[in-house]
Amino acid sequence: MGLEEKLPSGVLLTTVEQIVGFVRKTSMWPATFGLACCAIEMMAAGGPRFDIARFGMERFSATPRQADLMIVAGRVSQKMAPVLRTIYDQMAEPKWVIAMGVCASSGGMFNNYAIVQGVDHIVPVDIYLPGCPPRPEMLLDAILKLHDKVQNTKLGVHREREIEELEQRRLRALPLIQQTEEATR
C-alpha cells in the first residue's frame, strides 16, 4: 500500500516551479570572473578539499553562453565594467550573480576613482559575500543560500517582472563618486 495506489495515475504532488527550481539549483554552471585575490579562494572551492561539484557545479564555464551563475571575485575597474556587463548580457536566462569579497560588493577598503564601488552598479547582484578574501567555505555557504533562492524562483511573467524591478533598482543607484559630488554641491 503506497501513495501511488491511493492516487489516480498521472497525479503529480508538486508544482512545475518546484521541479524546475530543483533541476536548476542542482545543475548550475558558474562563469568565473576572477579579478583579484578572491579568485584564488574561488579556485580552491573547485578543488577536492571543498568539492564544489557535489552541488552540481561540475565545471566552471569559460564561456558566458553556457553559464547561469556569475561569480564576480575581486575589484572591478571602470574600464572593466563594460566587459562585465557584456558578459552578463551574454549569459542565458535565468542568470544569477554572486559578488564575492568586499571589493566586488562595495569597491574595497579604499574609495578609488578608478574602481567601481560595487558591482551592483553594473549588474543585479543576488548574493553578497563579505570577506577579504572570503574563505571557500563561505563561498559554498553563499552558493547554498543561492540554491534556496533558485528553488523558490518564479517562472514566466513573474520572473520577468522580478528581473525588471532589479534592473530598475540598479539603474537608480548612483556610483559613490557621483554621490560624493552631489553631497559637496
UniProtKB/Swiss-Prot annotation:
The keyword Transmembrane helix does not apply. HAMAP family: NDH1_NuoB (MF_01356). One of its GO terms (molecular function) is 4 iron, 4 sulfur cluster binding. NDH-1 is composed of 14 different subunits. Subunits NuoB, C, D, E, F, and G constitute the peripheral sector of the complex. Pfam families: Oxidored_q6 (PF01058). This is NADH-quinone oxidoreductase subunit B. It is found in: Cell membrane. It is a peripheral membrane protein. Belongs to the complex I 20 kDa subunit family. It is an enzyme of class 7 (translocase). Its EC number is 7.1.1.-. NCBIfam families: nuoB_fam (TIGR01957), PRK06411.1 (NF005012). It catalyses: a quinone + NADH + 5 H(+)(in) = a quinol + NAD(+) + 4 H(+)(out). Its cofactor is [4Fe-4S] cluster. NDH-1 shuttles electrons from NADH, via FMN and iron-sulfur (Fe-S) centers, to quinones in the respiratory chain. The immediate electron acceptor for the enzyme in this species is believed to be a menaquinone. Couples the redox reaction to proton translocation (for every two electrons transferred, four hydrogen ions are translocated across the cytoplasmic membrane), and thus conserves the redox energy in a proton gradient. Binds 1 [4Fe-4S] cluster. Its main location: membrane. One of its GO terms (biological process) is electron transport coupled proton transport.
